[in-house]
Swiss-Prot record:
Keywords: Ribonucleoprotein, Ribosomal protein, RNA-binding, rRNA-binding. It comes from Sulfurovum sp. (strain NBC37-1). Part of the 30S ribosomal subunit. Forms a tight heterodimer with protein bS6. Binds as a heterodimer with protein bS6 to the central domain of the 16S rRNA, where it helps stabilize the platform of the 30S subunit. It holds the Pfam family Ribosomal_S18. Belongs to the bacterial ribosomal protein bS18 family. It comes from the Bacteria. GO terms for cellular component: cytosolic small ribosomal subunit. One of its GO terms (biological process) is translation. This is Small ribosomal subunit protein bS18.
Length: 87
């Protein structure tokens, strides 16, 4: 049988700060949940709890609708620091 992956237990940074609402306009907090191609990262990588991961997902989708964050980035256009494109 294959060995099971061992994941380090991460703690939700929003629970530690006692955040009740995640605003879609706060791009500095949302960028930790996005990959370099602006895809939403899963819970096991970010360490968010289920409640806050759902809030982050909704906030990112709202930010995409209002054109604060791009939907996707082409492979050709990926830069070293993609969050320079946001400002």
């Amino acid at each position: 049988m294959a060995e099971r992956r061992k994941f380090k237990k991460r703690f939700c940074k929003y629970c530690e700060q006692k955040v009740d609402f995640i605003d879609y306009k706060d791009l500095n907090s949302l960028k930790f949940s996005l990959s370099e191609r602006f895809k939403i990262m899963p819970r096991r990588l970010t360490g968010n709890c289920k409640r806050h991961q759902e809030m982050v997902t909704v906030a990112i989708k709202r930010a995409r609708q209002t054109a604060l964050i791009p939907y996707i980035v082409d492979r050709k256009n990926v830069v070293e620091n993609p969050f320079e494109l946001i400002k």
